[in-house]
Regions:
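All-alpha RGS (Regulator of G-protein Signaling) helical domain and cognate RGS-like helical scaffolds
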Residues: 1-239
């Protein structure tokens, strides 16, 4: 956490040379992701700030004429399981399914930045999450998008009251729902006991690995929303 805040301060300091700020932003991406993974109480803060640092680094890279990859939604590729409870994984699968459906509808109408590939990535992630959960599949598969279609370009984000591009709000709402699901997970908290058995330490390692994967996955959604024009200042991202 200390490294994350230090690099974030350098990143935001306009009196510093842009190269120093760019390098600090890159470091902040991983520092904040590690904060989310190793300190569950800071999962939301770490995930959102990691995505914010990604976005800042990308903007600085453009000014420095450095080629940097555009955000791509991860799909839990190569993952066998998550040490997160079934209810939380199920809730995340619903969030991905909703976003996938909305993106499919938008792509069919050539609205915003939506593509069928983005829709498929959401839906693939949704299917994998519900499979990992082992829970009953409660996904509706189709959802009411009338409000989104009534405001295809910009819409008021109900979470902040701010106007933002509609496709970006879809991605941001997906991320917020997933963060809430992880934070409510019965497996996401750690105790402060001084004595640890090997099994307990192994369990902690498993949770940290799971949270690390999830923070990166969710940050992808936030990063994409920011790239599409969702406000990146703190008041828009943090409660």
């Amino acid at each position: 956490y200390a490294d994350a805040t230090a690099n974030a301060d350098i990143m935001a300091d306009r009196s510093r040379h842009i190269i120093m700020r760019y390098l600090a932003a890159q470091e902040a991406v991983s520092d904040w992701a590690n904060t989310a993974a190793y300190c569950p109480a800071r999962f939301a803060d770490g995930t959102l700030r990691s995505a914010q640092a990604r976005h800042t680094a990308r903007l600085m890279a453009a000014r420095l004429t450095i080629n940097i990859a555009q955000p791509t939604l991860s799909r839990c590729d190569g993952i066998d399981s998550f040490d997160i409870d079934a209810d939380s994984l199920s809730a995340m699968s619903v969030a991905e399914d909703q976003s996938g459906f909305a993106m499919e509808v938008f792509a069919a109408r050539s609205i915003g930045h939506a593509t069928l590939d983005i829709s498929d990535r959401h839906k693939t992630t949704s299917q994998r999450l519900i499979s990992f959960s082992g829970a009953e599949d409660t996904r509706a598969k189709t959802y009411d998008v009338a409000q989104l279609l009534a405001h295809p370009d910009t819409i008021v984000d109900s979470a902040t009251g701010l106007f933002a591009p509609t496709d970006a709000v879809i991605e941001m709402n997906c991320a917020r729902s997933e963060i809430a699901a992880v934070e409510s997970s019965s497996n996401s908290t750690s105790d402060s006991a001084q004595s640890r058995t090997t099994a307990e330490n192994s369990s902690d390692d498993s949770r940290q690995q799971s949270l690390g994967i999830l923070t990166s996955m969710i940050a992808d959604r936030v990063d994409l929303a920011l790239t599409w024009g969702y406000p990146s200042f703190d008041e828009a991202l943090f409660e």
